[in-house]
Amino acid sequence: MIRKPIWPYLVVGLFSFVIFQSFYHYYQLSTAAVPFMGMLRLRWLLEHWERFSFGVFFDSGALYAGLIGFGLPILVYASMDKNLYRQGEEQGSARFATLKEMRRFEDVDFEKNMIFSKQVKMGLFNFRLAYNVQLNKNVIVIGLPGDGKTFTFVLPNLMQMNSNFVVTDPKGNLVHEVGKMLEKAGYAVKIFDLIRLTNSDRFNPFHYMKSELDIDRISEAITEGTKKSEYAGEDFWVQAELRLQRALIGYLYFDSKDPETGVQLYMPNLGHVADLLRNIYIEDPDVPSPIEQMFEELNEHQPNNYAYKQWKLFQNFRGDTRNSVVAILSSRYSIFDHEDVRNLISEDTMEMDTWNTKKTAVFIAIPDTNNAFNFLSSILFAIGFEVLTHKADDILQGKVPGYSRKNLRHIQFIFDEFAQIGRIPNFAQVLSSIRSREMSIKIIIQAVNQLESLYKSDWKTIFNNCATHLFLGTNDKDTMKYYSTRSGKQTIRTRSTSKSHSYRNGSSSENKQIQGRPLLTPDEVARIGVEEGLVFISKQNVFRDKKASVYDHPRKDEIASSPEDKENWYEYTRKGTDIDGLLLYANDLTLQLKELFVA
C-alpha cells in the first residue's frame, strides 16, 4: 500500500532554502556595485559569478528568501493527490510463495516434521516453532485415484515415526508395507480388519463405558454411524429408537456389573442388543414379555436406574408406532447377527486408552468397494475421540498419577479415503478442539463434494479447521473453482497493438493496461503436472512444488513394496476369540433369556 511520501519534498525544500538564501545574498552584492536595475545589473551578475557562494545567512531578507524557497516544494506536495496506491497490486496481490517463506514452518529436526511435498515440511510440535508459524496440524489432501495420495503423503509421514498413528488402510496393504518398520522402532501395531473380519484385533464399545453417561454417547455413535440419510422427517423415528437403544444398552451396562462392588460380572457386546431385540415382541398383552421381566428385575436390584427410565419412556409407544421403532432398530442391529461381525466385537484388544501414552500404530482396513461394515470404523473413531480426549484432559490436569504433559504422545489420525468411513458424530467439533490435546487429523478425499455430501452444513467448518491443504489433482469443477479462488488474484499488464494501412500511409497505436486475473484459473488448477502438487498453508500464498516421494526418504529401504520383499513385508497373526469361553462367560445374557422362555 503506497501513499506519496512527504520526505522527498522536505529534502528539496531544505535545498531550496539554501539556494534562495544564497541567491538573495549574491543579489545584495550586486546592489552595492550597481545601484541601478536593468541590463547593467544583469551583466554584473553574469561577469562576477565567482563571487557567488552557498551558505546560510541570518539577516531578515535572507531568511524570508529561504522560507519562500522552502515553502514552494511543500505547496507542490499539498496540491498533489493524497490517495493510496498499491503499484503492481491494483487488481490483486497474489503470487506464488517462495521456498524461503515455506522454510519458516519447518522444524530444524527433520524427523519432527510433517511432509507435504518435495520441499515443504511443517513442524509437528508447535512448542518447537516460532510463535508466528504455530498453526494447527490438521490437513486436507485432495487427489484422484492414481495421484499418489498414499505414496506421496501417507507413507512418507508414517516413515517419519514422530508420533502415534491411527490410519485407515483401504485394501489392507499399508500395514504389510510399514508394519515391520514400526515394530522394529518399538510401536505396538493394532489392526482392525473390516475387509476380511478375521485375523484382527477386537473392538468392544462396552469396554470403554465408565459411567451411565457413556450409554448416550455410544447409542448416538451407533445411530449416526449406521444412518442412511439426513432426511429431517426421520428425526421422530431417530429419537424414538434412541430411547429403546439406550434402554437396551443401559440394561447390559447395569446388569453386567455387581451393583454393590462394581465388579464386572460379564462383558456384554453389541450382539447382545440384537439378541434382546429378537425377544422384545409381546405375544400376549396380559403376559409380560421376557424383556419386560428382565427390566423389572433390574429395577428391583438397582432402583430408578437410567436404563429402566428409558424403557418406561419407550413403553409409552403403542401399537404400530412401537412395532415400527422395534423394526427400525432391529434392522440396524441385524448386522451383528453375522458370526464374523459378532466375533469382531465380542471382546476388546484395541486398548484405546493407551493410544496417547504408549507408542502405538493402529490400522483400520476398510474395503473401498463395499461399505457394509464400515460403520464400525465410524463407531470406533467416535468412541476413540471421546476416550482419548478425556484421557488427555486428565493427564493435562494432573489427574493421572505418574503422567504429565511430557508423557502425552501426539496422535496423527490419517483418514485415507475418508468418504468410505461413514459419518463420525460431532466430527466438526472434534476437529476444532483436539489441537490442545496433542491430536491432529489428516483428511484424504477425491473432491470437495465428497465431504459436502457426508457432512452437509458442517463441511465448510471442517475445511476451515485444516490449516494446510495439499492439492494433488481433481476433475471436479467445484474443487477446481475452490482452489482457484483460494490462490487469489494477481495484477498483470497487458499490451495491445493496432495497425491500419492505406494506399499512401499507415498508422499504428499501442495501448497498455492493468488487469487482474486469477493466479491459477480453475483449468490451470486441473492441469498441474502429474508430478506436481499445490501446498496451501493458512495465511500464506500457494506454493507449487514436486510431490514428495518414498524414494527420497532416508528410511526408504525399511518398507516393503510387495510380499516378495521377505525382509520388510509384515506378516501378523491376531489371537482368535475363544468362542466356548465367550459362551460360558460373556454370553450369560443369552442363557438368562432361555431360562425365561422355558418359564
Place the predicted regions along the sequence by residue:
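Conserved ATP-driven motor cores of ASCE-family P-loop NTPases powering translocation/secretion/packaging/pilus
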Residues: 431-433, 440-534
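A broad, low-specificity signal for short, low-complexity segments enriched in glycine/proline
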Residues: 98-105, 119-131, 151-152, 321-327, ...
